[in-house]
C-alpha cells in the first residue's frame, strides 16, 4: 500500500472554520422564531424555582445605541445562565412610551395640541409614533440574539399598564404619601413643564456673579445688635451684602438669610473720591474676599454680631418699595459669597423651606415660558435670562451693586433641550418624602438589598437623604393622567377617591388614557358631587410610569405568576447603568416602599457607560460612535456579545474597532477549539462508543477533570454575574489547558489509532464529554455559535441547547490516583522545558520539526520516578520520535539546564526513518513486508489489533 491516507481517522465536520456570523446569524434567528425557542424554554422550565430580572424600559424614540446593546446583552447573558442553572427565568422586555421627546417629534409633524390638532388626536398620534419606535428597537434587540416575550412586551402606553399606573397612584395616595403644594420645582421654559430630578443634568454656564447691598431699614436698631466700641459706630449708609449668580430672581426676593452661629462683622468703608463713606455687613470669615473683589482698600472693623443676634432685622429691597427680614437657615455656608444668602422662596428649595418657616410670601413673578408676568414691576415681558442685564442696570441706578463679574459654574440644564432651567414655584402634586415617613423607610430598606458594586448602597442612600419631595405632576398632553378629583374651593381630594380611581382605571383599561379626558365627572360620582369637584388635568412624570412597573408589570403579568412560590420581592434583579441610582432604581424604590413597604428588588447591579478606546464619551461630532447595527452587519452579534461579556462592566466600558477586533480574535480561538472537538467526533456514537470512565486513558480522564474544574468556576462566575470571569476561564481552558497541551498531545492518537479502537474511543469519549460542557458554557454569551455547535454534536439531544441545564456527566481524577492532577501539572512543566529547547534546535536548524528529534531527560531520582510512570508513552506527550529518562548523574556535556529543578535535557536529531503514516521516526520503519514505508505501530493500527495506550 502506498497511500495510507484512507487509513487515518481524519477530522471531518460540517461546522465551518469561518463563522461568517453576519450572514449566518439571521438564518438561525428565523429558525429560533419559527420553532418558538422562547416558548420551548418556558415549557422546559415550568415549575422550576423562579428568577425575575425586571427590564428597565428604554425610551421609545430613536435607534438603539451601543449602551442599549451592552445593557440588553448583559441581561440576556444572565437570563440564559440562570435558565441553564435550572431556574424558570422569564424575560419581558419593556418600553417607556409617554413623555416630552415623543410629544416634540409629533409636534414637528402635526403641530401643537389645541392649535392645528386636538389634544385627543395628538395623543393618538403620539401612541402611533411610539408604537413604530418600539417595533424598530425590538428588531434591533432581537438581532442581538436576545430572547424574551417579544410578541408581548410591556409598554407603559398599553391600556392595562396605563390603568395599573393609575392604580399605583391610588395606592400611594391611600397610604398618605400624596401631597399638593405650591413649591419651587425644576422648570424647563422650553418644555413648559416641571422636570424630575432625573431629568436634570449639570453643565458649566457663565452667569453674572453679583454682590448686592440691602440697606438697613432702621440703622439705630441694627447697630444695637453689634458689639461696638463706645463712640465708634462709624458713618455712612449701612447695608447687608448678599451674593447671587441669578440676578433675575431678585424681583422675587423676600428675605436675606444668615446662619445663627456665624459671626458677622460691621465694616467701615472709607470715602474714596466721589464714593461716600459707607458701612457694610458680611460674614467675618469672608470679609477680606468681599473687600478684595470689590476693590475696597481702606476699611476697618467696627463691631461683631452673630446671625442669631441679627434675626428679624429689617432691610430695604434693593429696587422695590418694601422691606425684607433677616432670617436664619442651615444652608448658609462660608464656602463662597458673603455669608448672607439672597432668599426668593418661589425660586429655590432651601429658600422655600426657610420661607415656610418664617411665613414669607412665595412670590413667583415668572410665567411657564420663562417670561416675567405682566404685573412684574420694571421687568414685565422680559425673559428671565435676558433680564439679568436689566436687573444689573437697575441695581447700578439705585447704587445697590457693590460688585459684579462673569462667573463660570455648574448649573442645572434640561436633559432634552440642553438649555438652562429655572426653579419656579407652581402648584404641583408631590410624593412627600417625610409626611408619612417615606424617606426613613426607603433608607432602611436599602440595607436589605444586595448592591453590586457595593458603593451603590451609599450612593442611593445619599441621594434619598438629600432629595426633595418627588414632584410627580407634569403640564403635558401625552402622559398618564393624575386621575384625581379635587374640591373646587378647598382643593381637597374627593373623600371617595380610592373607588373613583378604580372606576377610572377600568375605563382606561378598556379605552386608554383618553378615557380620562372624555369621561364626564357626573358619570363617576353623580351630578351633585360633579358640581363641587373638578378633574386634575396634569399628567404623571414618566419616571413614575417606569418606577411603578414593579406593580404595573411584575405583580400583574401572568408570566410572573409562580403559583408554587411565595415571592418576597417583585423582582430578584434590576440591572441598569450607574446613572439609574438617581433615576429608575430610586423611583422604583420610593414607589414600592410607598405602596408595599418593601423594596421592589433583592439585588441591584450596575454597569458603567460605554466610551471609546481613549476613554471619551461617544459623540457624533467626534466621530467615535460605534453603532450596534454596524457591528452585527460586519462581525456578527456573537462578537458584540463576547465583547460585552469580556469587559469589567462595573467600570466604564471601552469599545472601538481595535477592541472589537480583539474580541473577534478571541472568538476565533474558541470557535477553532470547538471545531477540533466536533471534527474529531466524526463517526462517534455516544449510544455505543462511550468508554467507561475507569477504563479511559489517564490523560483523557485528566482532560475531563479539567473541564469539571473549569465548569465549577464558570458556573460560580455566572452566578455572581461575573461575565468577565467566565470569558477569562473559558479562554484559559480553550487556549491553555486544551489548545496548548491536551489537543496537541492527542492528535497523534486520534488520527493514527485503529478506527474504533479503545485508544481512539477513549479520546473521543473525553472530547464528547468536554464539548457537551463547553457548548453550554458558551450558550449564554455566544448564543448563535453554541446553537450551531449543538446541531453538529453527535447523539440524540433536545432541539436547543438553551432548554437544558449544565452538563452533569463530567468527572475528574481522584486525588490519590498515581497519575493525579498534580502529576499532570508537573508533566506540563517538563513538556514546557523540553519545548523551549526543541524551539532552539529548530532555530539552529538541528531539527526541522519536533518529530525529527530524540530527547534524553536527565532527572533527579524523584522527578525521574514521576516521568517514568508514562513509560514508552512519554514521547507522545513530548511529541518527539523518541524520549528516554536517565539519572541526573549520567548527564552528558551537551545536556542543557532547564527551568524545572533537577532536569537537564539533551536534544538530538534522529537518524531513524520517517513513517509515511504517522510521521514518527522509528527504527522499525520499512521492516515489515508489504508496508515498507511505515512503522510497526501503524501496521498494527491498520491490520492488527491496534496499539494500546494507558497513559497518553
UniProtKB/Swiss-Prot annotation:
<dbReference type="GO" id="GO:0002161">
    <property type="term" value="F:aminoacyl-tRNA deacylase activity"/>
</dbReference>
<dbReference type="GO" id="GO:0006428">
    <property type="term" value="P:isoleucyl-tRNA aminoacylation"/>
</dbReference>
<feature type="binding site">
    <location>
        <position position="935"/>
    </location>
    <ligand>
        <name>Zn(2+)</name>
    </ligand>
</feature>
<dbReference type="Pfam" id="PF06827">
    <property type="entry name" value="zf-FPG_IleRS"/>
</dbReference>
<dbReference type="GO" id="GO:0000049">
    <property type="term" value="F:tRNA binding"/>
</dbReference>
<dbReference type="InterPro" id="IPR033708">
    <property type="entry name" value="Anticodon_Ile_BEm"/>
</dbReference>
<comment type="similarity">
    <text>Belongs to the class-I aminoacyl-tRNA synthetase family. IleS type 1 subfamily.</text>
</comment>
<dbReference type="InterPro" id="IPR050081">
    <property type="entry name" value="Ile-tRNA_ligase"/>
</dbReference>
<comment type="subunit">
    <text>Monomer.</text>
</comment>
<keyword id="KW-0862">Zinc</keyword>
<keyword id="KW-0963">Cytoplasm</keyword>
<keyword id="KW-0479">Metal-binding</keyword>
<feature type="binding site">
    <location>
        <position position="918"/>
    </location>
    <ligand>
        <name>Zn(2+)</name>
    </ligand>
</feature>
<dbReference type="InterPro" id="IPR009008">
    <property type="entry name" value="Val/Leu/Ile-tRNA-synth_edit"/>
</dbReference>
<protein>
    <recommendedName>
        <fullName>Isoleucine--tRNA ligase</fullName>
        <ecNumber>6.1.1.5</ecNumber>
    </recommendedName>
</protein>
<dbReference type="GO" id="GO:0005829">
    <property type="term" value="C:cytosol"/>
</dbReference>
<dbReference type="GO" id="GO:0004822">
    <property type="term" value="F:isoleucine-tRNA ligase activity"/>
</dbReference>
<keyword id="KW-0030">Aminoacyl-tRNA synthetase</keyword>
<dbReference type="InterPro" id="IPR010663">
    <property type="entry name" value="Znf_FPG/IleRS"/>
</dbReference>
<dbReference type="InterPro" id="IPR013155">
    <property type="entry name" value="M/V/L/I-tRNA-synth_anticd-bd"/>
</dbReference>
<dbReference type="InterPro" id="IPR014729">
    <property type="entry name" value="Rossmann-like_a/b/a_fold"/>
</dbReference>
<dbReference type="GO" id="GO:0005524">
    <property type="term" value="F:ATP binding"/>
</dbReference>
<dbReference type="Pfam" id="PF08264">
    <property type="entry name" value="Anticodon_1"/>
</dbReference>
<feature type="binding site">
    <location>
        <position position="576"/>
    </location>
    <ligand>
        <name>L-isoleucyl-5'-AMP</name>
    </ligand>
</feature>
<dbReference type="InterPro" id="IPR023585">
    <property type="entry name" value="Ile-tRNA-ligase_type1"/>
</dbReference>
<keyword id="KW-0547">Nucleotide-binding</keyword>
<feature type="short sequence motif" description="'KMSKS' region">
    <location>
        <begin position="617"/>
        <end position="621"/>
    </location>
</feature>
<comment type="function">
    <text>Catalyzes the attachment of isoleucine to tRNA(Ile). As IleRS can inadvertently accommodate and process structurally similar amino acids such as valine, to avoid such errors it has two additional distinct tRNA(Ile)-dependent editing activities. One activity is designated as 'pretransfer' editing and involves the hydrolysis of activated Val-AMP. The other activity is designated 'posttransfer' editing and involves deacylation of mischarged Val-tRNA(Ile).</text>
</comment>
<feature type="binding site">
    <location>
        <position position="620"/>
    </location>
    <ligand>
        <name>ATP</name>
    </ligand>
</feature>
<dbReference type="Pfam" id="PF00133">
    <property type="entry name" value="tRNA-synt_1"/>
</dbReference>
<dbReference type="InterPro" id="IPR009080">
    <property type="entry name" value="tRNAsynth_Ia_anticodon-bd"/>
</dbReference>
<feature type="binding site">
    <location>
        <position position="938"/>
    </location>
    <ligand>
        <name>Zn(2+)</name>
    </ligand>
</feature>
<keyword id="KW-0648">Protein biosynthesis</keyword>
<dbReference type="InterPro" id="IPR001412">
    <property type="entry name" value="aa-tRNA-synth_I_CS"/>
</dbReference>
<dbReference type="InterPro" id="IPR002301">
    <property type="entry name" value="Ile-tRNA-ligase"/>
</dbReference>
<feature type="binding site">
    <location>
        <position position="915"/>
    </location>
    <ligand>
        <name>Zn(2+)</name>
    </ligand>
</feature>
<dbReference type="GO" id="GO:0008270">
    <property type="term" value="F:zinc ion binding"/>
</dbReference>
<keyword id="KW-0067">ATP-binding</keyword>
<feature type="short sequence motif" description="'HIGH' region">
    <location>
        <begin position="58"/>
        <end position="68"/>
    </location>
</feature>
<keyword id="KW-0436">Ligase</keyword>
<dbReference type="InterPro" id="IPR002300">
    <property type="entry name" value="aa-tRNA-synth_Ia"/>
</dbReference>
Amino acid at each position: 500500500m502506498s497511500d495510507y491516507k484512507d487509513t487515518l481517522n481524519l477530522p471531518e465536520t460540517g461546522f465551518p472554520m469561518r463563522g461568517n456570523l453576519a450572514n449566518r446569524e439571521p438564518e438561525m434567528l428565523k429558525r429560533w422564531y419559527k420553532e418558538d425557542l422562547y416558548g420551548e424554554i418556558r415549557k422546559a422550565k415550568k415549575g422550576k424555582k423562579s428568577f425575575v430580572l425586571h427590564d428597565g424600559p428604554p425610551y421609545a424614540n430613536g435607534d438603539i445605541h451601543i449602551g442599549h446593546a451592552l445593557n440588553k446583552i448583559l441581561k440576556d447573558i444572565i437570563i440564559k445562565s440562570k435558565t441553564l442553572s435550572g431556574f424558570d427565568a422569564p424575560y419581558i422586555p419593556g418600553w417607556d412610551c409617554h413623555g416630552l421627546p415623543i410629544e416634540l417629534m409629533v409636534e414637528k409633524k402635526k403641530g401643537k395640541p389645541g392649535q392645528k390638532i386636538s389634544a385627543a388626536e395628538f395623543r393618538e398620534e403620539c401612541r402611533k409614533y411610539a408604537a413604530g419606535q418600539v417595533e424598530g428597537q425590538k428588531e434591533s434587540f432581537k438581532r442581538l440574539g436576545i430572547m424574551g416575550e417579544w410578541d408581548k412586551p410591556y409598554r407603559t402606553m398599553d391600556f392595562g399598564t396605563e390603568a395599573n399606573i393609575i392604580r399605583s397612584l391610588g395606592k400611594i395616595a391611600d397610604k398618605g404619601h400624596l401631597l399638593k403644594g405650591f413649591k419651587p420645582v425644576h422648570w424647563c421654559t422650553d418644555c413648559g413643564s416641571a422636570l424630575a430630578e432625573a431629568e436634570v443634568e449639570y453643565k458649566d454656564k457663565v452667569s453674572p456673579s453679583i454682590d448686592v447691598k440691602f440697606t438697613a431699614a432702621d440703622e439705630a436698631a441694627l447697630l444695637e445688635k453689634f458689639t461696638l466700641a463706645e463712640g465708634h459706630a462709624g458713618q455712612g449708609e449701612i447695608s447687608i451684602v448678599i451674593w447671587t449668580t441669578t440676578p433675575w430672581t431678585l424681583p422675587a426676593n423676600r428675605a436675606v438669610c444668615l446662619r445663627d452661629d456665624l459671626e458677622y462683622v460691621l465694616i467701615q468703608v472709607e470715602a474714596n473720591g466721589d464714593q461716600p463713606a459707607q458701612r457694610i455687613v458680611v460674614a467675618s470669615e469672608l470679609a477680606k474676599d468681599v473687600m478684595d473683589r470689590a476693590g475696597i482698600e481702606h476699611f476697618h472693623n467696627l463691631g461683631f454680631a452673630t446671625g442669631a443676634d441679627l434675626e428679624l432685622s429689617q432691610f430695604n429691597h434693593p429696587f422695590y418699595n418694601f422691606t425684607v427680614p433677616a432670617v436664619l437657615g442651615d444652608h448658609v455656608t462660608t464656602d463662597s459669597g458673603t455669608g448672607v444668602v439672597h432668599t426668593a422662596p418661589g425660586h429655590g428649595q432651601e429658600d422655600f423651606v426657610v420661607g415656610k418657616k418664617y411665613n414669607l410670601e412665595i412670590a413667583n413673578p415668572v410665567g411657564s415660558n420663562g417670561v416675567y408676568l405682566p404685573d412684574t414691576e420694571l421687568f414685565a415681558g422680559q425673559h428671565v435670562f435676558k433680564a439679568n442685564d436689566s436687573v444689573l442696570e437697575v441695581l447700578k441706578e439705585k447704587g445697590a451693586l457693590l460688585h459684579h463679574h462673569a462667573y463660570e459654574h455648574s448649573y442645572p440644564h434640561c436633559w432634552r433641550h440642553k438649555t438652562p432651567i429655572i426653579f419656579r414655584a407652581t402648584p404641583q402634586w408631590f410624593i412627600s418624602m417625610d409626611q408619612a415617613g417615606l424617606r426613613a423607610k426607603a433608607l432602611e430598606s436599602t440595607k436589605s438589598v444586595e448592591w453590586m458594586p457595593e458603593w451603590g448602597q451609599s450612593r442611593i442612600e445619599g441621594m434619598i437623604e438629600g432629595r426633595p419631595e418627588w414632584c410627580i405632576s407634569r403640564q403635558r398632553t401625552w402622559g398618564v393622567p393624575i386621575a384625581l378629583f379635587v374640591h373646587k374651593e378647598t382643593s381637597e381630594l374627593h373623600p371617595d377617591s380610592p373607588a373613583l380611581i378604580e372606576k377610572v382605571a377600568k375605563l382606561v383599561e378598556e379605552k386608554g388614557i383618553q378615557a380620562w379626558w372624555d369621561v364626564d365627572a357626573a358619570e363617576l360620582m353623580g351630578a351633585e358631587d360633579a358640581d363641587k369637584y373638578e378633574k386634575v388635568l396634569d399628567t404623571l412624570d414618566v419616571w413614575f410610569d417606569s418606577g411603578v412597573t414593579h406593580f404595573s408589570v411584575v405583580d400583574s403579568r401572568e408570566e410572573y405568576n409562580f403559583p408554587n412560590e411565595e415571592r418576597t420581592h417583585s423582582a430578584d434583579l434590576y440591572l441598569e447603568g450607574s446613572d439609574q441610582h438617581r433615576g429608575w432604581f430610586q423611583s422604583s424604590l420610593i414607589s414600592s416602599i410607598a405602596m408595599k413597604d418593601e423594596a421592589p428588588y433583592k439585588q441591584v447591579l450596575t454597569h458603567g457607560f460605554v466610551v471609546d478606546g481613549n476613554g471619551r464619551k461617544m459623540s457624533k461630532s467626534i466621530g467615535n460612535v460605534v453603532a450596534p447595527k454596524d457591528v452585527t452587519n460586519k462581525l456578527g452579534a456573537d462578537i458584540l456579545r463576547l465583547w460585552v461579556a469580556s469587559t469589567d462592566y462595573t467600570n466604564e466600558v471601552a469599545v472601538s474597532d481595535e477592541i472589537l477586533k480583539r474580541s473577534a480574535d478571541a472568538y476565533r480561538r474558541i470557535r477553532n477549539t470547538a471545531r477540533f472537538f466536533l471534527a474529531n467526533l466524526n463517526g462517534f456514537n455516544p449510544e455505543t462508543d462511550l468508554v467507561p470512565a475507569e477504563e479511559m486513558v489517564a490523560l483523557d480522564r485528566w482532560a475531563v477533570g479539567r473541564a469539571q474544574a473549569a465548569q465549577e468556576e464558570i458556573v460560580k462566575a455566572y452566578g455572581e454575574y461575573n461575565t468577565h470571569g467566565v470569558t477569562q476561564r473559558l479562554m484559559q481552558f480553550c487556549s491553555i489547558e486544551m489548545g496548548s497541551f491536551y489537543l496537541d498531545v492527542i492528535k497523534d492518537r486520534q488520527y493514527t489509532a485503529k478506527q474504533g479502537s479503545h485508544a481512539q474511543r477513549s479520546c473521543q469519549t473525553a472530547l464528547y464529554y468536554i464539548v457537551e460542557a463547553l457548548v453550554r458554557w458558551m450558550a449564554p454569551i455566544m448564543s448563535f455559535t453554541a446553537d450551531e455547535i449543538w446541531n453538529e454534536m453527535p447523539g440524540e439531544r433536545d432541539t436547543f441547547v438553551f432548554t437544558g441545564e449544565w452538563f452533569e456527566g463530567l468527572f475528574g481524577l481522584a486525588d490519590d490516583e498515581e497519575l493525579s492532577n498534580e502529576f499532570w501539572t508537573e508533566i506540563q512543566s517538563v513538556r514546557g522545558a523540553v519545548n523551549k529547547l526543541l524551539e532552539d534546535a529548530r532555530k539552529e536548524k538541528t531539527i526541522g520539526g519536533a518529530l525529527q528529534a530524540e530527547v534524553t531527560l536527565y532527572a533527579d531520582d524523584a522527578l525521574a520516578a514521576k516521568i517514568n510512570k508514562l513509560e514508552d508513552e512519554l514521547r507522545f506527550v513530548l511529541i518527539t520520535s523518541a524520549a528516554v529518562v536517565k539519572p541526573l548523574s549520567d548527564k552528558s556535556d551537551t545536556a542543557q539546564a532547564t527551568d524545572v529543578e533537577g532536569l537537564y535535557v539533551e536534544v538530538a536529531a534522529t537518524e531513524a526513518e520517517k513513517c509515511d503514516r504517522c510521521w514518527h521516526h522509528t527504527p522499525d520503519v520499512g521492516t515489515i513486508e508489504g508496508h515498507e514505508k511505515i512503522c510497526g505501530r501503524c501496521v498494527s493500527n491498520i491490520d492488527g489489533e491496534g496499539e494500546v495506550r494507558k497513559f497518553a
